[in-house]
């Protein structure tokens, strides 16, 4: 697969970059994508939810009324889950939601996500981002030049760049990642993937 390289003004540079078909034109495995995204979202959960059961609610040591003769169902404690103010029956307790996915499946899922975006024509290769200082307005103008100012966009960089990260972090539609650290969810949760030219090689080295 080949894509034209463009600059930050949105104009073609005349250069064409060849993308590895193993990464950008692979067969899409929906099941691998499902497993990886499910794992990523589950692992974000804290699992700290907690309610009190009848042994943890304050009070309730005394039998609320006599066993027989009241016409009511028998009760041994006013903190039974059947009564107002009582403990919760089978309520949520703290536990982990971690799901393990093999590295092979994770790589397959990322290849599938990138191939899906490439097949839809939603990958853009940009020559370079040149920021001399932190400037959100400059980044917003670049997105506007690319026609992405109203679209959720993932920008992939070859390495961490503090100036670029801080320039783009206040733009709601923008998500910036280092190329080899972008997850399947990052790729799917955007309308367009913008890759810096140098980031293409890093992705191919990681996933090919």
From Swiss-Prot:
Gene3D superfamilies: 3.40.1370.10. Residues 45-84 are annotated as: Disordered. Keywords: Ribonucleoprotein, Ribosomal protein, RNA-binding, rRNA-binding. Residues 60-71 have a biased composition (Basic residues). SUPFAM superfamilies: Ribosomal protein L4. It holds the Pfam family Ribosomal_L4. GO terms for biological process: translation. The keyword Ribosomal protein applies. GO terms for molecular function: rRNA binding; structural constituent of ribosome. One of its GO terms (cellular component) is ribonucleoprotein complex. InterPro entries: Ribosomal_uL4, Ribosomal_uL4-like, Ribosomal_uL4_dom_sf. It comes from the Bacteria. Part of the 50S ribosomal subunit. One of the primary rRNA binding proteins, this protein initially binds near the 5'-end of the 23S rRNA. It is important during the early stages of 50S assembly. It makes multiple contacts with different domains of the 23S rRNA in the assembled 50S subunit and ribosome. Forms part of the polypeptide exit tunnel. Belongs to the universal ribosomal protein uL4 family. This is Large ribosomal subunit protein uL4.
């Amino acid at each position: 697969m080949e894509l034209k390289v463009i600059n930050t003004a949105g104009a073609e540079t005349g250069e064409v970059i060849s993308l590895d078909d193993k990464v950008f034109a692979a067969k899409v495995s929906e099941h691998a994508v499902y497993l990886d995204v499910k794992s990523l979202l589950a692992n974000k959960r804290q699992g700290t939810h907690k309610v009190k059961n009848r042994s943890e609610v304050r009070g309730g040591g005394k039998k609320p009324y006599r066993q027989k003769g009241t016409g009511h169902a028998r009760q041994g404690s006013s903190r039974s889950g059947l009564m107002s103010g009582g403990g919760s029956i089978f309520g949520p307790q703290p536990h982990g939601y971690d799901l393990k996915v093999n590295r092979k499946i994770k790589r397959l899922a990322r290849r599938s996500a990138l191939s899906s975006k490439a097949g839809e024509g939603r990958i853009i290769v940009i020559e370079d981002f040149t920021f001399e200082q932190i400037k959100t307005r400059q980044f917003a103008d670049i997105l506007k030049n690319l026609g992405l100012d109203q679209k959720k966009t993932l920008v992939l960089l070859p390495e961490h760049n503090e100036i670029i990260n801080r320039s783009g972090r206040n733009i709601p539609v923008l998500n910036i990642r280092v190329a080899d650290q972008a997850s399947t969810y990052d790729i799917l949760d955007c309308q367009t993937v913008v890759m810096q030219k140098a980031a293409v090689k890093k992705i191919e080295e990681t996933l090919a």
